[in-house]
């Protein structure tokens, strides 16, 4: 979808603008490169960031298609991003998942997703047409890496973020722990 791709490109542009001059930022198109190509391109990376996108294919977390508000699935992209998570876990490379990226990390570690959450705290079903994310607070867990990284901007262990999720973690993946959550538990 062109509108959605435009949103993703704006996010990418902001990430690149924020990059330090010493960073070597490589865009990985997991849909094109698949599992083998994604893992090869990650070799030598200092860190990996997996951005947002369409729904993770339910086959990766033991569920079925046909759920409410089902988005498009990019199975090959899923495989590429799952390979990036595997690479990061094997090599100790720092890994950050944003939106769908967090969901990919969770499924890579055996977790599951709630396929469609009710409208509310952080759902905007019109994101592809109005390009508006929902602003809401999240509570950051004490003692987490995230708390240490965000310490200068946290107010009473909270920060305001933007999101537009319609899915969330149902069962947390093995060895993962929650670093932050929205008021509804997401």
Regions found by a protein language model. Give the residues of each.
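The feature captures the ABC ATPase H-loop/switch
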Residues: 102
């Amino acid at each position: 979808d062109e509108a959605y791709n435009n949103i993703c490109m704006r996010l990418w542009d902001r990430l690149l603008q924020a990059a330090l001059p010493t960073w070597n930022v490589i865009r990985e198109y997991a849909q094109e490169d698949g599992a083998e190509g994604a893992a090869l391109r990650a070799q030598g990376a200092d860190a990996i960031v997996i951005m947002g996108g369409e729904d993770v294919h339910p086959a990766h977390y033991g569920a079925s298609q046909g759920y409410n508000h089902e988005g498009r699935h990019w199975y090959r992209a899923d495989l590429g991003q799952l390979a990036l998570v595997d690479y990061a876990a094997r090599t100790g490379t720092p890994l950050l998942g944003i939106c769908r990226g967090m969901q990919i990390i969770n499924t890579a570690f055996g977790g599951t997703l709630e396929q469609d959450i009710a409208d509310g705290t952080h759902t905007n079903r019109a994101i592809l047409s109005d390009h508006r994310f929902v602003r809401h607070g999240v509570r950051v867990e004490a003692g987490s890496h995230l708390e240490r990284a965000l310490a200068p901007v946290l107010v009473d262990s909270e920060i305001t973020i933007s999101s537009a999720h319609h899915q969330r973690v149902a069962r947390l993946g093995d060895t993962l722990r929650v670093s932050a959550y929205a008021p509804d538990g997401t």
